[in-house]
From Swiss-Prot:
Its cofactor is Cu cation. Belongs to the cytochrome c oxidase subunit 2 family. The gene is COX2. Its main location: mitochondrion. Keywords: Copper, Electron transport, Membrane, Mitochondrion, Mitochondrion inner membrane, Respiratory chain, Translocase, Transmembrane, Transport. This is Cytochrome c oxidase subunit 2. Component of the cytochrome c oxidase, the last enzyme in the mitochondrial electron transport chain which drives oxidative phosphorylation. The respiratory chain contains 3 multisubunit complexes succinate dehydrogenase (complex II, CII), ubiquinol-cytochrome c oxidoreductase (cytochrome b-c1 complex, complex III, CIII) and cytochrome c oxidase (complex IV, CIV), that cooperate to transfer electrons derived from NADH and succinate to molecular oxygen, creating an electrochemical gradient over the inner membrane that drives transmembrane transport and the ATP synthase. It comes from Solanum tuberosum (Potato). Gene3D superfamilies: 1.10.287.90. It is a multi-pass membrane protein. It catalyses: 4 Fe(II)-[cytochrome c] + O2 + 8 H(+)(in) = 4 Fe(III)-[cytochrome c] + 2 H2O + 4 H(+)(out). GO terms for molecular function: cytochrome-c oxidase activity. One of its GO terms (cellular component) is mitochondrial inner membrane. Component of the cytochrome c oxidase (complex IV, CIV), a multisubunit enzyme composed of a catalytic core of 3 subunits and several supernumerary subunits. The complex exists as a monomer or a dimer and forms supercomplexes (SCs) in the inner mitochondrial membrane with ubiquinol-cytochrome c oxidoreductase (cytochrome b-c1 complex, complex III, CIII).
């Protein structure tokens, strides 16, 4: 999969957020 720069930036920003949401639900 070839990721666009904005997709990489989005993933870098979203990962900690998603991890925090997962932590809240567990």
């Amino acid at each position: 999969d070839a990721a666009e720069p904005w997709q990489l930036g989005f993933q870098d920003a979203a990962t900690p957020i998603m991890q925090g949401i997962i932590d809240l639900h567990h």
